[in-house]
């Protein structure tokens, strides 16, 4: 039976890759809803190609622009806007599958709505679990939702895990691989001069600017450790991080009998997306087959926590529990935005996050509202810290 998709964040890199796979298999997948924030022109192009019933944008002005262009082209797609519209298309009876690809905390509410509606959720929005892991996973279990990870590392682990949950006791640990980003071998003393464009030049993956910066700081890998903790139910001390510059082995599962299972493939997000879309079947993703003879060599190294303090901060937040992970994520989003706008330097990202975690008392969250309150407080503190640190501002341009 054809799957009906709501694609949250259709104009981003995950959205592009998802629609590429969808277009290859029109007999398997159709689109119920596409959503974007303010990239209205790209959303219009997608709507004209995939003919969703609904399109959602962030504000009224963008909605008016999108609707005018769609009507002029003869499209009947309904255009909505605002956070509630995102929630509505995520829980609508018009879809059975929700691809959660909105970057950042903005993706939490619609992803949670999809879980509470019992949808099949392809999760690329790691912040949903970083901010409110217990709440989100409880919703998945309580409402019979199906959670399929789309992040390449978590999808790799999922593929290497036994299908029977009763066999999970045989797992010793899981190992998330990381490329090390663009600054893996750069002298740490020179990182203070890094520009946004340099930080966004990932050596292997094509990604959006925010996640590219997170990869450069390795905050992304720290968030993925937290995400893996919630998805796979393992404590932090059984989740390792391993630098693997070639990005061919996407993650590994180590078993108690000494076996290690790994998932390999070219670094292309269409592979995990196609796996999750068609699961438990396999379909063509348009990805070139891996040629190990051409690659010839795979290398590995332990992460340097002095070079990547954001990774250490994320692991600390996971160990502390409570609202620490939500605060970590919120402070990082504010700091990365400031860096991309050249208001702070690269190394100030970690410094800002650490200062917020030190200033905000940790506590056990009392429901989703408490998590959102912690998120708001961490954002306020991060903004204050950035505003009071003019010496860190970056004047250099590319």
Curated annotation (Swiss-Prot):
Disulfide bonds: none
Catalytic activity from the UniProt record: 2-C-methyl-D-erythritol 4-phosphate + NADP(+) = 1-deoxy-D-xylulose 5-phosphate + NADPH + H(+)
Superkingdom assignment: Bacteria
Gene3D superfamilies: 1.10.1740.10, NAD(P)-binding Rossmann-like Domain
Annotated binding of NADPH, by residue: 11-14, 38-39, 125, 127, 208
Pathway note: Isoprenoid biosynthesis; isopentenyl diphosphate biosynthesis via DXP pathway; isopentenyl diphosphate from 1-deoxy-D-xylulose 5-phosphate: step 1/6
Enzyme Commission number(s) from the entry: 1.1.1.267
InterPro entries cross-referenced by the UniProt entry: DXP_reductoisomerase, DXP_reductoisomerase_C, DXP_reductoisomerase_N, DXPR_C, DXPR_C_sf, NAD(P)-bd_dom_sf
MF term (GO), any: NADPH binding
Cross-referenced Pfam families: DXP_redisom_C (PF08436), DXP_reductoisom (PF02670), DXPR_C (PF13288)
Keywords for this protein: Isoprene biosynthesis, Manganese, Metal-binding, NADP, Oxidoreductase
GO BP annotation list: isopentenyl diphosphate biosynthetic process, methylerythritol 4-phosphate pathway involved in terpenoid biosynthetic process
Cofactor: Mg(2+); Mn(2+)
Binding site for Mn(2+): 151, 153, 224
Enzyme class: oxidoreductase
Family listed: Belongs to the DXR family.
Known function: Catalyzes the NADPH-dependent rearrangement and reduction of 1-deoxy-D-xylulose-5-phosphate (DXP) to 2-C-methyl-D-erythritol 4-phosphate (MEP).
HAMAP family linked: DXP_reductoisom (MF_00183)
Protein name: 1-deoxy-D-xylulose 5-phosphate reductoisomerase
Protein species of origin: Burkholderia multivorans (strain ATCC 17616 / 249)
Source species taxonomy: Bacteria, Pseudomonadati, Pseudomonadota, Betaproteobacteria, Burkholderiales
Gene that this sequence comes from: dxr
């Amino acid at each position: 039976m054809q799957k009906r998709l709501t694609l949250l964040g259709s104009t981003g890199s995950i959205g592009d890759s998802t629609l590429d796979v969808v277009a290859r298999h029109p007999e398997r997948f159709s689109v119920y809803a596409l959503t974007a924030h303010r990239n209205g022109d790209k959303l219009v192009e997608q709507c004209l190609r995939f003919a969703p019933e609904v399109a959602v944008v962030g504000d009224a002005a963008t909605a008016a622009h999108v609707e005018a262009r769609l009507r002029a082209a003869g499209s009947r797609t309904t255009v909505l806007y605002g956070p509630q519209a995102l929630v509505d298309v995520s829980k609508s009876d018009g879809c059975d599958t929700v691809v959660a690809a909105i970057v950042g905390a903005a993706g939490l509410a619609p992803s949670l709505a999809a879980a509470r509606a019992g949808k099949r959720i392809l999760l690329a929005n790691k912040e949903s679990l970083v901010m409110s892991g217990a709440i989100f996973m409880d919703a998945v279990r309580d409402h019979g939702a199906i959670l399929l990870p789309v992040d390449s590392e978590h999808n790799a682990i999922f593929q290497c895990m036994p299908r029977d949950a009763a066999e999970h006791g045989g797992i010793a640990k899981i190992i998330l691989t990381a490329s090390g980003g663009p600054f893996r071998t750069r002298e740490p003393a020179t990182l203070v001069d890094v520009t946004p464009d340099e930080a966004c030049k990932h050596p292997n993956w094509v990604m959006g600017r925010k996640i590219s910066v997170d990869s450069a700081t390795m905050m992304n890998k720290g968030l993925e450790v937290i995400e893996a903790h919630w998805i796979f139910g393992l404590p932090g001390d059984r989740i390792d991080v391993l630098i693997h510059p070639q990005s061919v082995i996407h993650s590994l599962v180590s078993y108690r009998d000494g076996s290690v299972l790994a998932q390999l493939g070219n670094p292309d997000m269409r592979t995990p997306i196609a796996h999750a879309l068609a699961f438990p079947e396999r379909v063509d993703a348009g990805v070139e087959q891996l040629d190990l003879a051409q690659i010839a060599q795979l290398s590995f190294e332990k992460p340097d926590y002095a070079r990547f303090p954001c990774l250490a901060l994320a692991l600390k937040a996971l160990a502390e529990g409570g609202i620490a992970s939500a605060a970590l994520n919120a402070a990082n989003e504010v700091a990365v935005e400031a860096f991309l706008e050249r208001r702070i330097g690269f190394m100030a990202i970690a410094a800002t996050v650490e200062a917020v975690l030190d200033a905000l008392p940790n506590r056990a969250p009392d429901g989703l509202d408490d998590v959102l309150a912690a998120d708001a407080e961490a954002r306020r503190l991060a903004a204050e810290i950035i505003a009071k640190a003019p010496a860190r501002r970056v004047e250099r341009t590319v």
